[in-house]
Curated annotation (Swiss-Prot):
Result for mutant: residue 77 to H: In sob3-6; Abolishes binding to AT-rich DNA; Exhibits a long hypocotyl phenotype in the light
Database matches in Pfam families: PCC
Biological function: Transcription factor that specifically binds AT-rich DNA sequences related to the nuclear matrix attachment regions (MARs). Acts redundantly with AHL18, AHL22 and AHL27 in the regulation of flowering and regulation of the hypocotyl elongation. Acts redundantly with AHL27/ESC to modulate hypocotyl growth inhibition in response to light.
Amino acid composition bias (Pro residues), ranges on this chain: 32-44
UniProt-listed SUPFAM superfamilies: AF0104/ALDC/Ptd012-like
Keyword list, A-Z: DNA-binding, Flowering, Nucleus, Transcription, Transcription regulation
Location(s) in or outside the cell: Nucleus
Phenotype of null mutants: AHL27 and AHL29 double mutant exhibit a long hypocotyl phenotype in the light.
Tissue occurrence: Expressed in the hypocotyl and the vascular tissue of seedling.
Organism: Arabidopsis thaliana (Mouse-ear cress)
Region (Required for the binding to non-AHL interactors): 164-169
Protein name, per record: AT-hook motif nuclear-localized protein 29
Primary gene name: AHL29
The PPC domain, residue ranges: 96-241
InterPro entries found in the cross-reference section: AHL15-29 (IPR014476), PPC_dom (IPR005175)
Length: 302
């Protein structure tokens, strides 16, 4: 050809092979029949280290799935562990000087004095009756007078037997468990008769309930017996002791009290309010014993 290039030699062979379609179709499917395996991209070490650092900077409590999968131990105090409510302090042992309140119900036909005495002996605690309500029948009372009136049968020794049914207006006193000094307990009662008269005195057992009787009481485990009036600080030592000792011995340390003698309220409470009715001894209508009871001499002090 006159074109400007020579078709002879190596260039002509290259040009000839380029324009041969049969050779082109034979060589084309070779890479499809035998594809070369492509190498998998390997993770770079620098990128892996950066990912580990980013995971470690994350809060372990914010992503529980990631922290559980990696098995890393979370640092610091777990959330919600502070300011937990503390359990309340419960004292299971009672103090020996604690007072317990009781509501005692005495069944109809039972002896009130015997029931309270048995309760105090079995529990080993003193019982102080604060109030009571209900009805009783055939009551025996100890009065300063030996003569009875208004249909009551009199008896010697100041004991008056009242027959019939009476309503309890007030019932107070103290019952102590053994060992206790004689005369340290007892019950005093005020009753209302069918005609409206008020009768009161110390209870002489039995005191039979003619219906359900409700008693409001307080119990205690120990009591101290002391003699009044107390001695002065400069004088002899005061007398005192536990209830079971019957008064205690002399020569004890004097209590730090004033020199004025205290009132007799403590002695009256310890003896079961046995002298609580003496203030009504001069009123014959209040006690219901008539003029003979008013003219009788007052009862000597304990």
């Amino acid at each position: 050809m006159d074109g400007g290039y020579d078709q002879s030699g190596g260039a002509s062979r290259y040009f000839h092979n380029l324009f041969r379609p049969e050779l082109h179709h034979q060589l084309q499917p070779q890479p499809q029949l035998h594809p070369l395996p492509q190498p998998q991209p390997q993770p770079q070490p620098q990128q892996q280290n950066s990912d580990d650092e980013s995971d470690s900077n994350k809060d372990p409590g914010s992503d529980p799935v990631t922290s559980g999968s990696t098995g890393k131990r979370p640092r610091g105090r777990p959330p919600g562990s502070k300011n937990k409510p503390k359990p309340p302090v419960i004292v299971t042992r009672d103090s020996p000087n604690v007072l317990r309140s009781h509501v005692l119900e005495v069944s109809s036909g039972a002896d009130i004095v015997e029931s309270v005495t048995t309760y105090a002996r079995r529990r080993g605690r003193g019982v102080s009756i604060l109030s009571g309500n209900g009805t009783v029948a055939n009551v025996s009372l100890r009065q300063p007078a030996t003569t009875a009136a208004h249909g009551a049968n009199g008896g010697t020794g100041g004991v008056v037997a009242l027959h019939g049914r009476f309503e309890i207006l007030s019932l107070t006193g103290t019952v102590l468990p053994p060992p206790a000094p004689p005369g340290s307990g007892g019950l005093s009662i005020f009753l209302s008769g069918v005609q409206g008269q008020v009768i009161g005195g110390n209870v002489v057992a039995p005191l039979v309930a003619s219906g359900p009787v409700i008693l409001m009481a307080a119990s205690f485990s120990n009591a101290t017996f002391e003699r009044l009036p107390l001695e002065d600080e400069g004088g002899e030592g005061g007398e005192g002791g536990e209830v079971g000792e019957g008064g205690g011995g002399e020569g004890g340390p004097p209590p730090a009290t004033s020199s004025s003698p205290p009132s007799g309220a403590g002695q009256g409470q310890l003896r079961g309010n046995m002298s609580g009715y003496d203030q009504f001894a001069g009123d014959p209508h209040l006690l219901g014993w008539g003029a003979a009871a008013a003219a009788a001499p007052p009862r000597p002090a304990f």
